[in-house]
Each structure stands twice: as structure tokens, then as C-alpha cells.
Swiss-Prot record:
GO cellular component: cytoplasm
Pfam families to which the protein is assigned, alphabetical: Aldo_ket_red
Binding-site list for substrate: H138
Gene3D superfamilies listed in its UniProt record: NADP-dependent oxidoreductase domain (3.20.20.100)
Descriptive protein name: Probable aldo-keto reductase 3
Catalytic class of the enzyme: oxidoreductase
Enzyme Commission number(s): 1.1.1.-
Active site annotation, chain numbering: Y70
InterPro entries, per database record: Aldo-Keto_reductase, NADP_OxRdtase_dom, NADP_OxRdtase_dom_sf
Keywords recorded for this protein, A-Z: NADP, Oxidoreductase
Annotated organism of origin: Oryza sativa subsp. japonica (Rice)
Top-rank lineage group of the source organism: Eukaryota
Family: Belongs to the aldo/keto reductase family.
Amino acid sequence: MAAAAATAPAAAVVRRMKLGSQGMEVSAQGLGCMGMSAVYGERKPEADMVALVRHAVAAGVTFLDTSDVYGPHTNEVLVGKAVAAAAATEEEVQVQVATKFGITPAWEVRGDPAYVRAACEGSLRRLGVGCIDLYYQHRIDSTVPVEITMGELKKLVEEGKIKYIGLSEASASTIRRAHVVHPITAVQIEWSLWSRDVEEDIVPTCRELGIGIVAYSPLGRGFFSSGAKLVDELPDDDFRKSLPRFQPENLEKNAAIFEKVNAMAARKGCTSSQLALAWVHHQGSDVCPIPGTTKIHNFDQNVGALSVKLTPDEMSELESYASADVVQGDRYHGTFLNTWKNSETPPLSSWRSGN
């Protein structure tokens, strides 16, 4: 049965939520903007993407996620233009832009103070803003004590160049060390029905420290929208074609997960993507998923996930479909950038001024 066979719920009112405990407020669902400019095939037409962002903001999704490495750089420029266009028509709407640093255009990871500052200045310029709402360390530099990186970020807060600090793909111990230097507002992690290893240590740590959780790839990089046939529709330069879970030997087995999710979605009168996204929303009021899309129709479907209600039994049933022993393939291939599993940094005592 095709994922679109079910009737999607009407668009929900997008509530506001507190992200973390430092005062940041965002829409309860964000918009991941990466695919508009990078990674998932060719860059999309700018006018279409500006229209999509304006549509999102008008619908109440005002939390936009980008990074300096998307493009590289072009996604921040796009988001900056879109926010300016939205502000011109939605005068009373406050948009929160989150961007990231730490992955160079050469796909190296850096967290040294000079790089942090230069990256921030570049993002401010490309976004066309005087202050970044939420600034994440995109990947953790395992050669630089996280306290050193955080020290520079703290200075940028004090200078009014960033408002809140976040981490992405950071281990629990790295989160704790960083939080001592300056409060962390949010940690961005991959969290979806088939990526749940963060629940063991990272999620509890965030909740203990009052840190908000931003879930990226909540639809399994599109898998829960259309299942195995997704790969057949991807262009050759789409990043997902290199991921272990999308390799033929794994995809054939993972297809059964989608079919079960899709069958439950049909019973509930929603789409498979709405069901998978609703599962993330039901993880707690401190969790903000940021599904990405390049199509207004898909955006509207994603907002509809806010109307899907799940019972504890339905949550458990969904989780059984995609348990760790069922999902085949890792999130990334072994040569990819640091993930939280290898994000430990040297002790602060090892750092000498001038490194």
C-alpha cells in the first residue's frame, strides 16, 4: 500500500515550546533547511525555497535550521533571504534561526577558538543578522578540549553575536563538560523510530541538565515517507545512497519496518511520515523535531503530524517494528565525520595557550 493512500489529518496549530531552560522559545516543530541547498541532490531553485520558508513561517513553523557547511555557505544565504522576505510580510512573527559551525568546506572538523570566531562572523554576514539565535557546534573537534571551544562561544554570547549555545552529535560526558563553561540550550541529535541509541545516555543527560532536545532526521532521512522505493527515486549524487541503511542488502530487510508502520498509519487515517513524526513528538514536551523538505505539500503533511495522537500501546507497537535488533545498517559509514560516539575531547589540562 502506498504511503500516500491514507488521508492526512488537517493541518494543526503549531504550538510554541520552551527549548531548554535558558529562555529560548521556538515553534514545537522546526524546518530543516539542509536539503534545499546541499547533500540531497542538486540545489533547489532559490525562489521556490524562499516561498517554502515564507509558507512555513506563515503556518507557524518559525524555527529554521541551517549550517555553514550546507552548500557550503549557500544555505545560510538562502535562509537569510527567506527570513527577510518573511519579515516583510509577517511583521509580528518572530523567526528563530539556528545555524552551526565546526565542519569546514573540506569536511574537516575544527573547534579551535580562531576558527569558532571566524565561522560565527561568516554566518552573521551570510544570514544578514546581527545576532544568531542558536549557534551549534555541528561536530565535536576531538583534538580540542570542549572547554576551549565553549570559552570562545561564551565570549561571542557576551559580545551579543549569539544568543544561545547548542551542541550537535555530542556524547553525554562532552555535554556535561561544555555545560559547566556556559549553559547549553539545546543538543541536536538524530532521533527517529530507527535511530534510538541516544535514549540510553544522551537524552537522560539533557533532561537532567535542563537542555532542550532537537531531533534531526526524524523521518529516517525520508525512509518513513516512502520506504525502500525512496532510493530508486534519488539522484546519483544524493548523500543517502552512500549510507549503510540504504544499501541493497540492508534496505531489503528494512523495507519490512516501513510496511508495518505504513499499515498502522492506514488504520489511524494518517500517512506513514506523520505517524513516524508523531512518535518523535510524543517523546516529550522538551523535544523539537526538525523535519526537512523542499516541497510545500510535504511541509503541510509534516505539520499535520501534530494532530496525530498515539496511545502508550501504539507507541510500544511502533517501537517494536524498529527495535535495534531489527534495523539493519548503521546511521553513517565508518569514515564519516565524528558522531557522538567518538566526540570525546582531551582534558583541559592538556591545552596550552597558542595551540
